[in-house]
Each structure stands twice: as structure tokens, then as C-alpha cells.
Amino acid sequence: NRGGGLLDPKNHFILDLRQPLLDKGNVDVLSEINVEAGWECTTCQACTEVCPVGNQVEKSDEIRRLEVLVEGKVPQEYQKLFMNLQESGNTEGRTDSPLADRLPTFSPDKEYVLWLGCFARYELDPNFTKSVENFANILDVAGITYGVLENEHCSGDPANRLGDKLTYNMLREHNMEQLAHASKVVTLCPHCALNLEKEYAKYSEVNYDVSHHTQVIAQLIEEGRIEVKKGSNGKVTYHDPCNLSRMLDEVDAPRTAINATTDEFFELEESGRNTLCCGAGGGLWWKKETTGRTHLVRAEQVVNSEADTVVTGCNFCYGMMNQGLKPLTPEGRSEIQVKDVADLVSE
């Protein structure tokens, strides 16, 4: 609710249920909580991270699952999203991908599946396409073989977080078949990485290893397989993606890569596992603006930090930073550059 939204996790998901449970012993969850506020949860797990008694407050997707599967209630903004996922296997209802067409196709003799995800595959932020190509170039320079799947579907993250478990399992089963001959998967999307590695494993055995692209880049730097030069990006800071830092517990690899490219790196006010959510998780990227979003709070922190460049390791964070910084950058000040870790290293 730092962005001005309705959601207050402690009150809406814990205290609103405590007294009715004490009074009645058994309650109808949907009648006792503010369901509208539940749809604003980004599932970033910040509330769980700081909860002193370890309540898993972030499990709002369970509340949304009740709304979707039991009540059949889906906010209008998500109805088209669910239809696209069910009919086309991706969030945008697309069948074409110019980016995928330009990249090598995966075959079992290649080391990595380069998993694009819907954001990159269908260019939800066209600027991010260059980040994917920069990472592919890094792999080429290091002599690593890779390819994209011809029939990659959405990892299912939006359906999973928004409560549509039937659609999620349909996507999961399809992707598991597509990955049957893969031993290693690398992706620029922490949301996809989380699902491909940890969420899928809740349903069936996963026979491939999943890496985030910053982990691969950091390893290549440490092994001396790529030469990285200091760039001219001015003062550089890093926005930790929630899925990467909290859910995948990766905060070191991006910094290893960034520090190889600059001597002017500094931390933001909230960083590491204590990062501030960009506001796009939990399917909210596809939700129309209602009240506020935390990406404006985060963008203001970046502006006030006097950074020249803000780096991130997530496609959604990349898009939200671009959206948030433009209206908040003071007139007369140079535009703050938003870059992926791969962009810095590729330069």
C-alpha cells in the first residue's frame, strides 16, 4: 500500500480473519476479508520477509483461487489474459515472435535452452529485446551453445499468481514436454525461473537445472571466459527484483557482474532481500492503473539517489522502471538510463 493502494497485508489477511476465527472457529474466508485488496497483492513476499512470527501473508493467490475457481469471479482486466493463456499459450494471444525467429533453435546437442518468457518473446517493452540479444551475444563470445524452444508457452506465472490453477497446470504440462530433452535452462525472467525450477517441482520431478542469466554471466566473468571492460555509465545503482532476491535467494551474482563494469556502483535505500517491489508481480503488469503503484515510489528513490544508471535483472522491473522514471525525472536533468545486467556487461 506504499503506492497508495488498498492492500494492507497485516490487516487484510491476518487481523481481518483472526477475530472471526476466534468467535466462530470456522469462517467463509471470502466474506470476512477485503477481496478487492487481495487482487492488488504483487506476491512479492516482502510482508512474509519482515513478519516477526513467520506468517505466510503473501499467499493471497489462495484467496484469488477461491474467487476464480469457486466463485467464478475474475476482474475484467484479467479475463482477456486468461483467455489468451488458454487459447494461445501466452499472455498476448500471439503466434509470431520476431525475436525468437532471430535466435538459434534449441536441439538436444546444445548446452542451454534460452527461455524467453512472454515479456521478451512478445516484446512487452521493445527496449528489452536488445537486452536479450546482448545476453545471447555474451553466450556467443563465451562459446556456449544455446537455442530457444519453437513451441515455448508461458511459464504460467500469471495464472498461478492470479489463482487460475487449471490454466497453470495446462501450461506447466505443455512446457515440461517441451523441456524433456533439456538439461540446462537459462532465462532473463526471474518469474519464469521460479516457476520452471521450484513451482513445477511441486507437481512432478524436474530433470533440468535452471539458471538466471546473471548467474551465468557472473560465472563466466569469474572463470575468465569473457573479458569485461569498465563502461561509462556514470553513477550506477541496482534494483533487486523480488523473485530473484527473495524467492530465488540470489543477490550476489548481479553485483559480481555490475562491479566488473564500473567503479561507481552504490546501493539503493532498500536493497537485497529487503528490496522494494516494482509493482508488476502477481499479474499486476496486466492490470489497469487504479490508485497507486510502488514503481513510482521506487522510481522516486532512484531519482533522489542521483544515479545516472539503474540496473535490474528482471524484464518486468525493467519495464516498470522505464515507466516510473520518465514522469519523475526533474526538468533539465539528464534522463536516467534503465539497463539490464546483460546490457552493462555486453558494452
Task: Identify the residue ranges that each predicted region occupies.
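Non-transmembrane accessory domains of multi-pass membrane transporters/channels
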Residues: 1-7
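Iron-sulfur-cluster electron-transfer modules
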Residues: 8-200, 220
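Sequence-level motif detector for i,i+2 pairs with an aromatic at +2
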Residues: 109-110, 208, 233
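Cofactor-cradling patches in redox/metallo enzymes
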Residues: 121-212, 243-347
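Acyltransferase donor/substrate-recognition loop-hinge adjacent to the catalytic core
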Residues: 218-235
